[in-house]
Amino acid sequence: MKATDLRDLTTAEIEQKTQSLKEELFNLRFQLATGQLDNPVRIREVRKSIARAKTVLRERELGINNG
């Protein structure tokens, strides 16, 4: 998910999205440990999506208006 898409969401929606991404990351890491992961690149994508969401939340806290 792109940062511009995240900026259109409400803070609660972003927090919910972050939580679901964290759960997905947990499941992906579990699959990696058990050798069942088909696409290891997905772990990186999910981590970056979490970082983007946290960045948008932090921008809102600081009052930065990017985008």
UniProtKB/Swiss-Prot annotation:
Domain of life: Bacteria
Gene Ontology MF terms: structural constituent of ribosome
InterPro entries tied to this protein: Ribosomal_protein_uL29 (IPR050063), Ribosomal_uL29 (IPR001854), Ribosomal_uL29_CS (IPR018254), Ribosomal_uL29_sf (IPR036049)
Keyword match Nucleus: no
Protein name: Large ribosomal subunit protein uL29
Entry-linked Gene3D superfamilies: 1.10.287.310
A GO BP annotation: translation
CC annotations in GO: cytosolic large ribosomal subunit
One Pfam short name: Ribosomal_L29
Keywords: Ribonucleoprotein, Ribosomal protein
UniProt xrefs under SUPFAM superfamilies: Ribosomal protein L29 (L29p)
Coiled coil (UniProt feature): none
Record family assignment: Belongs to the universal ribosomal protein uL29 family.
